A protein has these predicted regions:
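Transmembrane helix-loop junctions and nearby membrane-interface residues
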Residues: 34-37, 83, 87, 117
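Helix-to-loop transition at the C-terminal end of transmembrane segments
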Residues: 33-51
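Aromatic-acidic/polar surface patches that form glycan- and anion
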Residues: 20, 24, 43, 47, ...
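Membrane-embedded helix bundles of polyisoprenyl
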Residues: 124-133
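Short hydrophobic/aromatic helix or loop-helix immediately within or flanking a transmembrane segment
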Residues: 52-53, 57-58, 67-91, 96
Length: 133
Protein backbone atom coordinates (compact mmCIF):
# COMPACT_ATOMS: atom_id res chain seq x y z
CA UNK A 1 0.00 0.00 0.00
CA UNK A 2 1.36 3.41 -0.92
CA UNK A 3 2.21 5.94 1.74
CA UNK A 4 -0.60 8.43 0.81
CA UNK A 5 -3.18 5.63 0.82
CA UNK A 6 -1.99 4.39 4.21
CA UNK A 7 -2.17 7.94 5.59
CA UNK A 8 -5.68 8.32 4.22
CA UNK A 9 -6.79 5.06 5.86
CA UNK A 10 -5.22 6.14 9.16
CA UNK A 11 -7.14 9.43 9.05
CA UNK A 12 -10.37 7.64 8.19
CA UNK A 13 -9.90 5.20 11.09
CA UNK A 14 -9.18 8.11 13.42
CA UNK A 15 -12.32 9.91 12.25
CA UNK A 16 -14.38 6.74 12.67
CA UNK A 17 -13.27 6.44 16.32
CA UNK A 18 -14.00 10.12 17.06
CA UNK A 19 -16.34 11.36 14.33
CA UNK A 20 -16.86 15.08 13.95
CA UNK A 21 -18.97 17.07 11.57
CA UNK A 22 -16.74 18.71 8.99
CA UNK A 23 -17.93 20.53 5.87
CA UNK A 24 -17.05 17.43 3.84
CA UNK A 25 -19.07 15.14 6.10
CA UNK A 26 -21.99 17.57 6.00
CA UNK A 27 -21.81 17.70 2.19
CA UNK A 28 -21.75 13.90 1.95
CA UNK A 29 -24.72 13.62 4.32
CA UNK A 30 -26.66 16.20 2.28
CA UNK A 31 -25.84 14.37 -0.96
CA UNK A 32 -26.89 11.00 0.48
CA UNK A 33 -30.11 12.52 1.83
CA UNK A 34 -30.81 14.03 -1.59
CA UNK A 35 -30.11 10.71 -3.34
CA UNK A 36 -32.53 8.98 -0.99
CA UNK A 37 -35.46 10.82 -2.64
CA UNK A 38 -34.30 13.19 -5.39
CA UNK A 39 -37.87 13.68 -6.62
CA UNK A 40 -38.79 15.35 -3.32
CA UNK A 41 -36.52 18.28 -4.13
CA UNK A 42 -36.60 18.18 -7.94
CA UNK A 43 -40.38 17.80 -8.35
CA UNK A 44 -41.83 18.82 -4.96
CA UNK A 45 -45.43 18.14 -4.04
CA UNK A 46 -47.45 18.75 -0.91
CA UNK A 47 -47.84 15.57 1.06
CA UNK A 48 -50.64 14.32 3.34
CA UNK A 49 -51.76 17.00 5.79
CA UNK A 50 -49.46 19.73 4.49
CA UNK A 51 -52.04 21.17 2.13
CA UNK A 52 -55.34 19.79 3.35
CA UNK A 53 -54.84 20.69 7.01
CA UNK A 54 -51.95 23.07 7.66
CA UNK A 55 -52.16 25.37 4.64
CA UNK A 56 -55.96 25.46 4.77
CA UNK A 57 -55.79 26.18 8.50
CA UNK A 58 -53.31 28.98 7.83
CA UNK A 59 -55.61 30.41 5.16
CA UNK A 60 -58.68 30.22 7.40
CA UNK A 61 -57.24 31.24 10.79
CA UNK A 62 -53.94 32.96 10.03
CA UNK A 63 -51.41 33.00 12.84
CA UNK A 64 -54.06 31.68 15.25
CA UNK A 65 -53.73 28.33 13.47
CA UNK A 66 -50.42 27.87 15.32
CA UNK A 67 -52.40 27.15 18.47
CA UNK A 68 -54.95 24.79 16.91
CA UNK A 69 -54.35 21.14 17.79
CA UNK A 70 -54.69 18.54 15.07
CA UNK A 71 -55.36 14.91 15.97
CA UNK A 72 -54.85 15.73 19.63
CA UNK A 73 -51.58 17.66 19.61
CA UNK A 74 -49.95 20.77 18.24
CA UNK A 75 -47.97 20.58 15.02
CA UNK A 76 -45.75 23.59 15.53
CA UNK A 77 -43.21 23.08 12.76
CA UNK A 78 -45.70 22.24 9.99
CA UNK A 79 -47.88 25.18 11.01
CA UNK A 80 -44.89 27.55 11.15
CA UNK A 81 -43.88 26.28 7.73
CA UNK A 82 -47.41 26.93 6.42
CA UNK A 83 -47.39 30.43 7.93
CA UNK A 84 -44.00 31.27 6.40
CA UNK A 85 -44.95 29.83 3.00
CA UNK A 86 -48.26 31.68 2.90
CA UNK A 87 -46.77 35.00 3.99
CA UNK A 88 -43.44 34.96 2.17
CA UNK A 89 -43.80 32.98 -1.05
CA UNK A 90 -45.89 32.63 -4.15
CA UNK A 91 -48.20 29.62 -4.05
CA UNK A 92 -46.16 27.88 -6.76
CA UNK A 93 -43.20 27.69 -4.36
CA UNK A 94 -45.07 26.26 -1.36
CA UNK A 95 -44.31 22.57 -2.07
CA UNK A 96 -40.62 23.34 -2.62
CA UNK A 97 -40.53 25.32 0.62
CA UNK A 98 -42.14 22.47 2.57
CA UNK A 99 -39.62 19.99 1.19
CA UNK A 100 -36.70 22.36 1.81
CA UNK A 101 -37.77 22.71 5.46
CA UNK A 102 -38.02 18.92 5.79
CA UNK A 103 -34.57 18.56 4.19
CA UNK A 104 -33.13 21.12 6.64
CA UNK A 105 -34.71 19.33 9.62
CA UNK A 106 -33.18 16.00 8.52
CA UNK A 107 -29.77 17.65 8.09
CA UNK A 108 -30.07 19.29 11.52
CA UNK A 109 -30.81 15.90 13.08
CA UNK A 110 -27.81 14.35 11.33
CA UNK A 111 -25.59 17.24 12.42
CA UNK A 112 -26.78 16.82 16.01
CA UNK A 113 -25.79 13.15 15.95
CA UNK A 114 -22.19 14.23 15.28
CA UNK A 115 -22.13 16.82 18.07
CA UNK A 116 -19.20 16.28 20.46
CA UNK A 117 -21.52 17.20 23.34
CA UNK A 118 -23.74 14.22 22.57
CA UNK A 119 -22.28 10.94 23.78
CA UNK A 120 -23.49 8.26 21.43
CA UNK A 121 -21.84 5.00 20.40
CA UNK A 122 -21.02 4.40 16.74
CA UNK A 123 -22.17 7.80 15.47
CA UNK A 124 -21.49 7.02 11.78
CA UNK A 125 -23.73 3.96 12.00
CA UNK A 126 -26.45 5.98 13.73
CA UNK A 127 -26.30 8.55 10.96
CA UNK A 128 -26.55 5.74 8.40
CA UNK A 129 -29.61 4.43 10.22
CA UNK A 130 -31.24 7.85 10.10
CA UNK A 131 -30.48 8.13 6.38
CA UNK A 132 -32.03 4.73 5.73
CA UNK A 133 -35.13 5.31 7.89
Amino acid sequence: MSRPAAEHLRRLASWWREPRLTPWVFAVLAALLFLRRPDALLAPQLWAEDGSVFLLGQDAAGAAALLEPYMGYLHTLPRLTAWAAANLLDVAWWPAFYNAVAFAVWLALLARIFSPRLTLPQKPWLAAGVLLA
